Design a protein with these regions (language model features):
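Interfacial transmembrane-helix starts/ends
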Residues: 27, 59-88, 104-107
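Membrane-interface junctions at transmembrane-helix termini in multi-pass inner-membrane proteins
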Residues: 111-142, 182
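Short helix-kink/termination motifs in transmembrane helices of multi-pass secondary transporters
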Residues: 3-12, 42-46, 70, 74, ...
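Helix-terminus/linker motif at the lipid-water interface of multi-pass membrane proteins
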Residues: 3-35, 53-54, 90-98, 157
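Residue-level recognition of pore/gate-forming positions within transmembrane alpha-helices
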Residues: 3, 31-34, 82, 114, ...
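Interfacial segments at transmembrane-helix termini and the short loops linking adjacent helices
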Residues: 20-22, 68, 85-115
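Helix-loop junctions and terminal segments of transmembrane helices
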Residues: 29-59, 64-71, 124-129
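Membrane-interface helix-loop junctions in multi-pass transport and translocation proteins
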Residues: 89, 93, 104, 131-134, ...
Length: 182
């Protein structure tokens, strides 16, 4: 589902004859917006073994405490990145050249999705580490389906901004469902 979600937008952009220059700008925006999730990935890698161990020991309160603490830590460490990527998106894109300025709104939209991703914290790791991998798989497919459907409807009219919106909404939906499931 992750591969589908990360490939569908580019495939649908190309299928709708969005120019290769705009597809390149979109991919640059997705790569830059993922900077905001770098801390999430790093912390998740270190937290998952501890969560698995505590869950196996049925220490559910400690699992919850670590999940909440890591979510807060990830969010607050990521705030400066969010401020830069959203508040100064034109300047960030300008670093790649004047032709990339067209991607400033796209970058901001994608970064909003990453904000929610970090706020939700290690939800995927919690589901996988606690034996709910089938539920996580289903949630992932749900997110991929939302991504594809939104891309099909939004890209023809809104181009890369539509793809960014589809990406952000599917990421938000995926994270919110994971959070409520936990």
């Amino acid at each position: 589902a992750f591969i589908v979600t990360n490939s569908a937008d580019v495939f649908i952009l190309k299928a709708n004859n969005v120019g290769t220059d705009m597809v390149g700008i979109y991919k640059t925006c997705t790569n830059i917006s993922m900077l905001a999730a770098t801390l999430l990935v790093a912390l998740n890698t270190t937290v998952q073994p501890k969560i698995t161990q505590l869950y196996t020991q049925q220490n559910y309160e400690e699992v919850r405490r670590i999940a909440v603490k890591s979510s807060k830590l990830i969010f607050w460490l990521s705030v400066p990145v969010f401020i830069i990527l959203i508040g100064f998106s034109k300047y960030v894109m300008w670093l790649y050249g004047n032709e990339f300025l067209k991607g400033a709104l796209c970058l901001s939209i994608l970064t909003v999705g990453q904000v929610i991703n970090t706020v939700c914290g290690p939800t995927a790791q919690l589901l996988n580490a606690t034996g709910y991998h089938k539920q996580f798989r289903n949630i992932s497919f749900f997110g991929a389906l939302i991504n594809i459907v939104l891309n099909l409807f939004l890209v023809p009219t809104y181009g890369i901004e539509g793809a960014a919106f589809a990406n952000a909404i599917s990421m938000i939906a995926w994270n919110v469902v994971c959070t409520f499931y936990i």
